[in-house]
Every structure is written in C-alpha cells, then in structure tokens.
Curated annotation (Swiss-Prot):
MF (Gene Ontology): glutathione transferase activity
Domain GST N-terminal stretches: 1-81
Protein name, per record: Glutathione S-transferase
Keyword entries, A-Z: Cytoplasm, Transferase
Binding positions for glutathione per the UniProt entry: C10, K35, V52, Q65, N66, S102, D103, L104, H105
Quaternary assembly: Homodimer.
Lineage, broadest ranks: Bacteria, Pseudomonadati, Pseudomonadota, Alphaproteobacteria, Hyphomicrobiales
Organism from which the protein derives: Brucella anthropi
Substrates-to-products reaction catalysed: RX + glutathione = an S-substituted glutathione + a halide anion + H(+)
Record's function text: Conjugation of reduced glutathione to a wide number of exogenous and endogenous hydrophobic electrophiles.
Disulfides per UniProt: none
UniProt gene name: gst
EC number of this enzyme: 2.5.1.18
Length: 201
C-alpha cells in the first residue's frame, strides 16, 4: 500500500494505523498547494479532489476519505479490534466514531482558512468547542481508549485533530478526557514511529 500524505495533516491518522497494523506500506508526500507528488507527478491524477489522504492499494486502485481508508486498513490487518465482525454492534460503534471524527475534522478545518477575521475565527472556535464537548461526553474514564480498552482507528483520528487544537494554542482545559486520550495514543511506540517518519516531534 502507498499512502499519499502531508506532514501533520489528517493523513497522519491512516499513517498511524498502517504502523500499528504492521502492514507493509510506502509513503509519498504531497505538495497540496502545487498539487504535486514528491516525484513531481500530478496529484489530481491520484485523487481528483486534490486532498490527502489517498491510499493506493494496488496500481490504479486508490481509496480516498479517511473513514474509508481507516476501515480498509483495519479490515486487511491482523488486529482484531480494527475489524469487528460484520453486522456486530462493535463494528457499528467503530463506524459511528469514525463518522463523528469526520464531523470534528470539519469543525477544525475552518481554523486554517486564509484571511480569517476575528469574528469568523470566534465562530469557528465556538463550533470546535461544541464538537469537543460532544467528544468529551462520549469518552469514559473507565476505558483506556474511546471504544474500550483496545486502541482503534478513531483514537488515532481524534488524536490527530486534538493535536491541531494544541498546535493552535486553543484552550482545551475543558476536555480532560480528550487530552488524556491523546496522551495515551502519543505514548504508543508505533504512533511514535509514524510521527518520526513524518519528521514530527
């Protein structure tokens, strides 16, 4: 598998899951402004929407959208928690959490819009806080991770997004469970491996 990524972007989530799954993978960086791959290729030829991530599973076959990519990687791994049985409540909960991560991701996206006025930024942050409050309510102090005691794909995705808030110096003190989740995720050796591969601390 080849993952097309941008350093620190949402593509870090599937990078983490590839690392955790122990599957062989290649990485190719993308210049999202120029829409060029690291080897100078036209990224629109890989993903017509021009966004990361994109996962090439074999020559000519590419999956886009994080939720789909994360589930695909899980289903092709040997990690039981990454691929609950079809039709099970556990699988539905995993997909529910991935869907919420997409909502949380969308809330944060506005933070990176160019020329954002103070009023617009305040509105974006209010929406982020609303979504983070929802996430906080979903998390349990009794569990090590979001869906229980096993690390799963939503943990990776949510942690990447929460990290954007940390990087933007947002006040996240109202979300201790979310911050603790991120802390646990960042402590995992395979997560640290993915960060190192992207040149992140």
């Amino acid at each position: 598998m080849k993952l097309y990524y941008k350093v620190g972007a949402c593509s870090l989530a599937p990078h983490i899951i590839l690392s955790e799954a122990g599957l062989p993978y290649e990485l190719e960086a993308v210049d999202l402004k120029a829409k060029k791959t690291a080897d100078g290729g036209d990224y629109f030829a890989v993903n017509p929407r021009g966004a990361v991530p994109a996962l090439e599973v074999k020559p000519g076959t590419v999956i886009t959208q994080n939720a789909a990519i994360l589930q695909y990687i899980g289903d092709h791994s040997d990690v039981a928690a990454f691929k609950p049985a079809y039709g099970s409540i556990e699988r539905a909960r995993l997909q529910e959490a991935l869907g919420f991560c997409s909502d949380l991701h969308a809330a944060f996206s506005g933070l990176f819009a160019p020329n954002l006025s103070e009023e617009a930024r305040a509105g974006v942050i209010a929406n982020i806080n609303r979504r983070l409050g929802q996430l906080e309510a979903m998390l349990s102090d009794k569990n090590a991770y979001w869906l229980g005691d096993d690390f799963t794909q939503p943990d990776a995705y949510a942690s990447v997004i929460i990290g954007w808030g940390v990087g933007q110096k947002l006040d996240l003190s109202a979300y201790p469970k979310a911050l603790k989740l991120r802390e646990r995720v960042l402590a995992r050796p395979n997560v640290q491996k993915a960060f190192k591969e992207e040149g992140l601390n």
